[in-house]
Curated annotation (Swiss-Prot):
Zinc finger boundaries on the chain: unnamed: 45-81
Subunit structure as annotated in this protein's UniProt entry: Homodimer. Homooligomer. Interacts with host RB1; this interaction induces dissociation of RB1-E2F1 complex thereby disrupting RB1 activity. Interacts with host EP300; this interaction represses EP300 transcriptional activity. Interacts with protein E2; this interaction inhibits E7 oncogenic activity. Interacts with host TMEM173/STING; this interaction impairs the ability of TMEM173/STING to sense cytosolic DNA and promote the production of type I interferon (IFN-alpha and IFN-beta).
Disulfide bond entries: none
Species: Human papillomavirus type 63
Biological classification of the source: Viruses, Monodnaviria, Shotokuvirae, Cossaviricota, Papovaviricetes
Name the UniProt record assigns to this protein: Protein E7
Record's keyword annotation contains Transport: no
UniProt motif LXCXE motif: location: 22-26
Amino acid sequence: MVGEQPNIGDLVSQEEPSVLDLNCYEDIPAEEEESEYPYAIVLPCGLCDQLLRLTCVSDLSTLTRLEELLLGSLRIVCPLCAIRHQRH
């Protein structure tokens, strides 16, 4: 821009836009895709609400399924409630 006021020539570029390929062509080795992660879980007991701490090690897809189960109807109970409510 030359001067205090911009003119249309300053704002419009005379160059043609170029097309950029934004696809990622990186190859990820299979061992990285299926690597296992330690995952800490803190949740209340399904019967007495005492906090439980679990650690799982699995691949990401299995951990995602576990999360869906825990957010659904699956309830984990503490050892004391497991003994108290054990069916004989």
